[in-house]
Amino acid sequence: MRSNKRIFILFLSLALCSSFLSANYAFKKKVKDVCKSYRISMESNQLELETDAVSISMKSGRNNFEMFMLVGFASAGQAIAHQKQMGLSNAYIPGTIRVSVDVPVSKGEFNTFMATCKSDTAISLADGRLDSSEFMQEIMKTMEIL
């Protein structure tokens, strides 16, 4: 009888963990697919999913870090909108999005541009309700250069 309880608890915990992992997988897949459509390679290890924030790390070319910033925020916005649209109880919906872009300065040296925005702002960018120039002006207020 005791082993049956343990087996039941094990299966219950696996079921709960797998539903959370599938929400994470769907979120990461959506971000990767959007980045891929803009010819930006994205790996799962470049996404860090926290409880109420998602961090995206990217490496750009020398002169196009703005495009990487925009695509990073827009892809996260689309993934959040998709999670909301599915309406699942285990949906991953972070409140904050952080994007950091490494930009080469010289051989072997990088500047890191880091910006943060609320998920509603990123969804507005992804939906086209917010113009990209307006969005860049908004995130420039929080941008840090490391």
Language-model segments: what does each one mean?
Residues 1-9:
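Bacterial N-terminal signal peptides that target proteins for export
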Residues 26-62, 87-146:
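Polar/charged, Gly/Pro-rich intrinsically disordered segments
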